[in-house]
Each structure stands twice: as structure tokens, then as C-alpha cells.
Amino acid sequence: MRGREFPLVLLALVLCQAPRGPAAPVSVGGGTVLAKMYPRGNHWAVGHLMGKKSTGESPYAYEGGNMKEQLREYIRWEDATRNLLSLLEAKGIGSHQPPQWEPLGIRQSTWDSKDGSNFKDMGPRLKVDGLSAPGSQHEGRIPQLN
């Protein structure tokens, strides 16, 4: 034997001597076919329940404790909410109307309301890429496409 083959033969002998058994523990009674397929239980809800927290920390969960203490806690939250609302209304933030936005610039209409057929003369404009703009010498000409 060569030196490289010896560790492989030794590994094969060790693996043959290892006890064979199920990868996951199965109940002694054997159980049904589904119990053998899912030895740790049914996993249909695993993805559905991921990230869910315990309801014990929720203020809305019924703890079965003292009703007077729960009522006091509710009244404290209600008072805190009222105080916050009054502070917001005092600053003017609590109004139900949406904020009035200022226009970005003063916009003037280009339409002459007295003469409904013409646009207002906006003064001379520049020529861009061979096309004439209103107010230029070539105004009114139809550009030719090549």
C-alpha cells in the first residue's frame, strides 16, 4: 500500500464500524408514516410564525391580573395622549387642514384672456438647434425634416 491510500482505508473501516440509526430521533412506538417523515413535528406553520413575538408584552393582551391596575394604566395612557395632543395643537401642528404650499415661482399665464385666439408676446427668444422660437425672425415657418 501506498501512503496516500492508508488514511482512506482506515476511514472506510471506521465508518463501517459506526452504529447505524436514524438521523433524527424517532419515537419508540414507530408511529405513522407522517411521524417518520417529520420526526420533529409538523412544520407547516414555520414560515408563518417567523418573527412573531409573545403577546405577554403587549399592552392589549389580557393578563388576568388586577382590573384596577389595568384601568389605571389605561387612564395614564389616555392622559398622556391628551397632553401630547394639546401640545401639538398649541404649536399649530395639530390642525386638520393640509399645509399651504407656496408656489416655487410666480407663474404668469401665456394666454391672453382678452383675445382668445392669440398667445401673449413673450418677447424675443433664442434659436435652439436650428428651430426658431416665438419672437424670432423665422417665427411661423414650419421646420423641414431631412
Swiss-Prot record:
What are its GO biological-process terms?
A: mast cell degranulation; negative regulation of voltage-gated potassium channel activity; negative regulation of voltage-gated sodium channel activity; neuropeptide signaling pathway; positive regulation of behavioral fear response; positive regulation of peptide hormone secretion; positive regulation of phospholipase C-activating G protein-coupled receptor signaling pathway; positive regulation of respiratory gaseous exchange
Q: Where is this region: Disordered?
A: 95-146
Matching entries from Pfam families are given as: Bombesin
Query: What is the annotated localization of this protein?
Result: Secreted; Cytoplasmic vesicle, Secretory vesicle lumen; Cell projection, Neuron projection
Return the Basic and acidic residues bias intervals: 112-128
Show the GO MF annotations.
neuropeptide hormone activity
Keyword Secreted part of the UniProt annotation:
yes
- The source's superkingdom equals Eukaryota
PROSITE patterns noted in UniProt: BOMBESIN
Signal sequence extent: 1-23
Q: Which family does it belong to?
A: Belongs to the bombesin/neuromedin-B/ranatensin family.
Q: What is this protein called?
A: Gastrin-releasing peptide
Q: Which species?
A: Sus scrofa (Pig)
